[in-house]
């Protein structure tokens, strides 16, 4: 006698009745399966598994316009879903590109959200957006992010009323400052090890060759130098006096072993925001996976992939604040 475990839709002409009757199983995909009742010992219907809960992801290149400049990016969305979806804009760290945010954008799309990762203008030598590294400043990156948000809100696949930003390191600082613009009506922020310490680093490194590239320049930690315009803008800038009016939910995720941005900067931010939480990833340095490590990020434990801890936190935040 055979026992049958059924995890699909079924229809039966008999529930173990007369021996001449048959049991017919109708899979979601494939041909019906028939058994004589005499062949069946019992029928067990098991709960469905989560194996099919993730969506296939469609990734397309999409350019946004900022004045005469084009901003390169990639749009991630669930394949075959036509509805307008809550959308997360991913803002990368200094010296990196949109590619560094692939794991997070892809995970969001698999979960049913829309995500967009873009290259800041002059954000690195590898940027596919217009602009040069020499012209990049924090305020120029704020303008990039605002232009991206405005552009995406015009897309049919984007729910313009449910826009979030996920920013890492310098991208996290830019995201935090940008969110203070109430006209954007962002619904929330997710910040990975936000670089709220940049003004302090500039002040410190002014004593040791400056914040630019070259031996002794702290810019080397991030993979490249910084312009005088960048340093002048952020020198003596009070980050915490310029954030904190954003009242929507803020999720900050920071590594306990971060040697570039100490976790204390995020602890201070949580005290400033009216609605913020901090999750500390034990053992993580400046970057939660290999795509997001700065020049010194590989030291002190960051070579390990922490996305198995980080991505569930991101998805939990989204399911709470933008349920599908």
Predicted regions and their residues:
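Short beta-strand/loop motif that positions the catalytic acidic residue
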Residues: 246-247, 252-254, 258
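Hydrolase active-site cap/lid region
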Residues: 177-229
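Conserved alpha/beta-hydrolase
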Residues: 107-128
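The serine-hydrolase catalytic nucleophile loop
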Residues: 94-106
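Alpha/beta-hydrolase active-site loop
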Residues: 100, 134-156
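Active-site glycine-rich loops that stabilize anionic/oxyanionic intermediates
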Residues: 85, 92-96, 256
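N-terminal cap/lid segment of alpha/beta-hydrolase-fold proteins
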Residues: 52-80
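Catalytic active-site module of serine/aspartate enzymes centered on a nucleophile-bearing elbow/loop
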Residues: 292-324
């Amino acid at each position: 006698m055979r026992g049958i475990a059924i995890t699909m839709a079924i229809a039966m002409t008999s529930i173990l009745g007369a021996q001449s009757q048959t049991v017919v199983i109708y899979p979601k995909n494939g041909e019906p399966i028939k058994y004589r009742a005499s062949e069946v010992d019992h029928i067990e219907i098991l709960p469905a598994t989560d194996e099919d809960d993730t969506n296939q992801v469609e990734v397309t290149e999409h350019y946004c316009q900022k004045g005469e400049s084009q901003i390169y990016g990639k749009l991630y969305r669930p394949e075959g879903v036509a509805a307008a979806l809550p959308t997360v804009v991913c803002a990368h760290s200094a010296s990196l590109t949109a590619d560094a945010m692939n794991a997070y954008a892809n995970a969001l799309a698999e979960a049913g959200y829309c995500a967009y990762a873009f290259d800041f203008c002059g954000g690195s030598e590898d940027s596919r957006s217009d602009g040069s590294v020499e012209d990049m400043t924090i305020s120029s990156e704020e303008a990039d992010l605002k232009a991206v948000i405005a552009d995406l809100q015009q897309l049919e696949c984007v729910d313009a009323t449910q826009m979030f930003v996920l920013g890492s390191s310098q991208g996290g600082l830019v995201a935090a400052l940008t969110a203070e613009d109430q006209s954007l009506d962002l619904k929330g922020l997710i910040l990975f090890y936000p670089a709220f310490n940049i003004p302090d680093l500039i002040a410190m490194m002014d004593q040791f060759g400056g914040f630019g590239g070259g031996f002794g320049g702290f810019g080397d930690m991030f993979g490249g130098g910084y312009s005088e315009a960048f340093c002048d803008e952020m020198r003596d800038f009070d980050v915490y006096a310029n954030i904190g009016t954003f009242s929507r939910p803020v999720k900050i995720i920071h590594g306990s072993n971060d040697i570039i941005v100490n976790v204390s900067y995020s602890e201070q931010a949580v005290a400033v925001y009216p609605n913020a939480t901090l999750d500390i990833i034990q053992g993580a340095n400046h970057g939660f996976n290999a795509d997001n490590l700065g020049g010194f990020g590989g030291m002190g434990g960051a070579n390990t992939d922490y996305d198995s801890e980080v991505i569930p936190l991101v998805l939990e935040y989204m399911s709470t604040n933008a349920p599908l």
